[in-house]
């Protein structure tokens, strides 16, 4: 039984019902409907922390989905799972693929920045200040891109950029 048919969560059930109605109303192919079903089941599994199941669904959705924009969200969610699992290198690969297909995906840019910032912090702990500066500058670059796309988001990143002297104000993003 598909995950979408066994949800006990009210919000997930509501989303599933609305998504099913939209799929019936909009002119979509069987392939597109199947891709969306796998994507939806992947999101549901991911929300419950069932990452292996979520990845299986996302990979199947990727196999079926041909639209680059839709694929960007699948890739982004795969990146989220790898981030949650501490697999930052893999996560970066998926985030890069997501923004390659959809350059207007600020959350992927933000997550790339977060990983570079984390690696910068690790470099400091290891006593490698030069490497930390390179990593922090990479984080700053990605945060600036994310903030340009979503100026009212990523307030902590904006503050970090100001505090560290990487921007003087929002105009210089």
UniProtKB/Swiss-Prot annotation:
What is the membrane topology here?
A: Peripheral membrane protein
Q: What is the lineage of its organism?
A: Eukaryota, Viridiplantae, Streptophyta, Mesostigmatophyceae, Mesostigmatales
Q: What is this protein called?
A: Photosystem I assembly protein Ycf3
InterPro entries in alphabetical order: PSI_Ycf3_assembly, TPR-like_helical_dom_sf, TPR_rpt
| Paired cysteines (S-S) | none
UniProtKB keywords: Chloroplast, Membrane, Photosynthesis, Plastid, Repeat, Thylakoid, TPR repeat
The subcellular location is: Plastid, Chloroplast thylakoid membrane
Function of this protein? Essential for the assembly of the photosystem I (PSI) complex. May act as a chaperone-like factor to guide the assembly of the PSI subunits.
